[in-house]
Every structure is written in C-alpha cells, then in structure tokens.
Amino acid sequence: MTTTDCLQQYRDSVLEIEFFISEAHIKDASGNFIHPEKFRDFVISSAVVRFSIAWETFLENIYCAFILGEKDTQGGVVPCCVSVSNLDQAHKLLIGTNKYFDWINPDLVVQLSALFLNPDNPIKTAINSTKSDVLDLKTIRNAAAHMSSTTQQKLDSVASRLYGHQAINSKVSEVVSFVRSDGKTQWEYLRDLLDVATENIAKGVV
C-alpha cells in the first residue's frame, strides 16, 4: 500500500463515519429527530470506536509503507533503519513478540519510531503534537466500547476539562458533541486534528 493509499483509506473511513452520524441525526419537517436519542447515542459511540480504529489502522499501514521503502506523498523517502521483503514481514516486525501492538497509545507509537526510523521522523513529530488529544480520544473510545466505573471516571475527567466544571455520569455523545471555544464540536476538532496529522505523516513532514 502506498502512502497515498494509506491516507485515502483513512479519509474514506472518516467520511463513512460522518455519513452514519449524519443519517442518525436526520430531522423531520417539524425539526424533530426521526431516530430516538438512544439510537443516536449508539451511533455516536460506534462512530468513536470506528474513528479510533481508522486512526490506528492508518498508523500501522503507514509504518509498513515506510519500512517497505514506499515514497511519501511528496516523492521523498522516509529513512528507515530496517529492511523487509514483504508486507507480512513488516507487520510481524511491528508486532514483535507481542500478540498485538497498541496503536492508540501515543508513547508506544513514538517509541516504535525510534526503533525503526530516524530520530527525527514524521510519525514522531505528528504524534508528539497531538499526544494529549489522542489520549482524550483513547479515553472516549474506551468509554464508548465498554462503560465501567473506571472508564466513566476517566470520561468524566475529560468532560470536566472540556466543560470547565465538574462533570458526573457524562455520556460519550455529550462529550463529542460539546461545542468548544473555537466553535467546533469535540468531534470536529479531533477529526480535523487527525486529518492534518495523517496528511503530514503521509507527506513525510518532520
């Protein structure tokens, strides 16, 4: 998969997610939601999980592309410290002796780049600039996937910081729909932030 393909696949996934969100929030002629709140909340939670998966998939794919020597979207080559002959080997190299790699963990992603890429590399640069927001996405994703006392507490912590006051029993749909001071919802903010990050990584921007 080329770096252009990696970026396009990510963006196609996000567009599909936004379509589902839009469909869930259709209103009738009177301005009332067609679907009940419980349905809309379900779609939002599912969308957050899918969004996280799209981001993680992009990171794994772009790592493999760099390791295989694929050119970035600007025509350059991201220097790599290892060499593999095929995609399967690239995936195995990234996973190592683990059963899987935690692509939503920004610290681990940066550590991985230090093993296989030059010290200054596009993945490290992009991840370091988005770390706190990716951690927020991880918190929201975990709550969307499985609400427990632990995930609820962490979601409330994110919500409290966003709202500027203590939040209790926050809902995923409420957090991602929160309108920030810049006029964007939290969903729009994360969507735009990671779109820039994925584009810069694919471009090889250090």
Question: Where do the language-model regions lie?
Answer:
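Charged alpha-helical initiation segments
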Residues: 1-53
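A cross-kingdom marker of C-terminal helix-rich interaction/assembly modules
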Residues: 2, 165-206
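Charged, amphipathic alpha-helical oligomerization/scaffolding segments
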Residues: 9-12, 16, 50, 54, ...
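Short, flexible helical or helix-coil boundary motifs
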Residues: 21-24, 28, 94, 101, ...
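Helix-loop junctions and short alpha-helical segments
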Residues: 40-43, 47-137
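Long, hydrophobic, amphipathic alpha-helical segments used as structural scaffolds
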Residues: 55-70, 145-155, 198-206
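Short, charged amphipathic alpha-helical segments flanked by flexible coils
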Residues: 67-87, 152-176
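Histidine-centered, metal-coordinating catalytic motifs and their short helical/loop contexts
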Residues: 129-156
